[in-house]
Amino acid sequence: MSDSAPEIETPVEEAPKAATPAKSPAKSPGRAKKAKKDGSDKPKKPKAIPTHPPVSEMVVNALKTLNEKGGSSVIAIKKFLVATYKVEIEKLLPFIKKFLKGAVLKGEVLQVKGTGASGSFKMPPPAKKVDKPEAAPKKKAPRPKREIEKKEKKVVAKKPKPAVEKKAAKPAAKKAVAKPAAKKAAAKPAAKEPAAKASPKKAAAKPKAKPTPKKSTAAKPKAAAKKPAKKSK
């Protein structure tokens, strides 16, 4: 048989794709920190309470107690602190040197020898107390004469005011008194009328004293008689 068999198409199988891993949700930074904290939480040791005073106080006490003329070295200070306070001196040594440097700059400690934290140190002499002179009471400055004169003038000018008021009040009283006096004056003329009537009696009595003119009349005829005698010559 010459007829060929029909060709059967075979499906081409595709290679399976590699499975991509599923993405894990991104962790927030806050959660990550919490996770770290949860893992690092360990019981903390309580801070040891120091059984000694501050370094500065211990060093000052050492220098005052040793009180060496040439100053105390750092070694001498260390020995004193160990004997007195029973401290771990190697741990405190950096703090001791730091305090000494700062105290020298401030003038709280004198450095007799050496430089920096090496050498010998001592306390400065106590400062002498200077007695402050008591403040003298302030004297009041004398006032100038002009001011005193002005004040006196003011006082003198103020005093006459009540006197003027009194004087002004007196005329009012006089006027009140003068009114009844006028009434009395008006009443007096009535009393003088009888005196006026009595005056004619005195006038009538005056003619009684007229004998003097008679003498003068008697003397005149004698003179007349003498004149004719001259004619006879």
UniProtKB/Swiss-Prot annotation:
One GO biological process term: nucleosome assembly
Listed InterPro entries: H1/H5, Histone_H1/H5_H15, WH-like_DNA-bd_sf, WH_DNA-bd_sf
GO MF term set: DNA binding; structural constituent of chromatin
Biased composition range(s): Basic residues: 172-186, 199-213, 223-233
Alphabetic keyword roster: Chromosome, DNA-binding, Nucleus
Region Disordered, residue ranges: 1-55, 115-233
TM region(s), chain numbering: none
Its job: Histones H1 are necessary for the condensation of nucleosome chains into higher-order structures.
Name of the protein in question: Histone H1-I
Organism per entry: Glyptotendipes salinus
